[in-house]
Amino acid sequence: MYSKSRKIQSVVVMLAFMILAASAWGGAPARAESGVSEPYRIVALGDSLTAGYEHGYTEKSVPYGYVEQVYEQSLFHGLRAEYVNYGILGLKAEGLNRLLEAVSGGRTVKADDIQKELQDPRKETLAAQTAQMAKSIRSASLIVLTIGGNDLLPVMTKLDSGATAEEITTYIQTILDQYEKDLEASIRTIAALNPKAQMVMSDQYLPVPAPLQFGSTTIELYPEAKRKLLLDGVTKLRGKLELVSTRLADDGIKLQVADVSSLFVGHELEYTSIAQGDIHPNHLGYAAMGRAFATAIWGDYRTIRPRQANVQMSVVVAGKELPASAAPPVLRSNRSFVAMRDITDALGAKLTWNNATQSATVSYNNHTVILAIGSAYVTIDGKKVKLTTPPAFLLKSGKESKTYLPLAALSEALGLQVTYRGTLQTAFINK
């Protein structure tokens, strides 16, 4: 896959990179207290695929790429997760290696010290973050990575120059030999900084579709001879990844390879913006990448159940969605409320109801929380605190009335992580 816009004949044309918003740790930070799990920290490194770039993005765009989907999958698995994304548009393997050398050596660098003519408008800001990158990598539980598409970028120019197939093949081999060296050096640097982190990177997909067949008529969207040469390059890049992974394994360093390329075969027009002249994935393509990474990391890809039209959101507690029999969650003033018994059962918390005071006492994880219907205050471990949400309330559900509690206020008071993902319309509660 070529992680930079470039000229392709017919429908495939040049498109310049646009600005992505800077990334920082995502998700709520874990609270340092007894009984609370250590955070599951995800660090993302690499090129524009890691940055989550899509066709038409501007500096105000919020990425929703494979990294964000890996983060969501970690929440689905009951992990108290957070993430940081250091993806740089236009980055090549050599640039990644230089960046990581600076990170490891504790040096502050400028963008040109990493790679000349980087296309990312955030390049100086990102290059200056070597100290933060080192801290992030050292504390990471999982490191995800994409790199290689930009290394093959010069092949397009070579193809347009009229070079022979033999010359192109030799040229690709030269590029990939250097790619192999830079990639291995990068992974070894990461492993030296954090030998315990799980490392997963993807292979590269080819965005150029095969010829379309309509009866006896064949339509080439791109010259087939050239497409096959590009496909050969992508295939050989996968081979280099496997060679590096094998050598690293011999030294006790595990690098997993997520199979992205096969998922795009036959879906190039569906999963990318190639018809608009941009080779980057669209939301469907990034979802496919997310599935590939999640499968490599956890062995599955999780989703929520389809919601009925009257259900505003879903709730996942410690990796399990509230059962279909649970009362539907309710949104009030953009805050989530759940039926009292449903959430306490899901947590395994002790619940006591005081009918006289119309209050619920929830005990869990060495915390005791008291919420009263209509009260603007909550009592947390004996201390009265003003709610920042609407108060608990009664709501008729079928033939009975149910007590609804403010989800975030209750969960945070119990020392839990609460994360709402608008992309999924789902609240995740993790220990």
Predicted region positions:
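Charged, often glycine-rich, active-site loop that binds/positions anionic groups
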Residues: 89-116, 271-280, 366
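Catalytic His-Asp segment of secreted/periplasmic serine-dependent ester chemistry enzymes
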Residues: 207-308
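Structural recognition of the beta-strand scaffold that forms the well-ordered cores
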Residues: 41-46, 50, 82-87, 141-146, ...
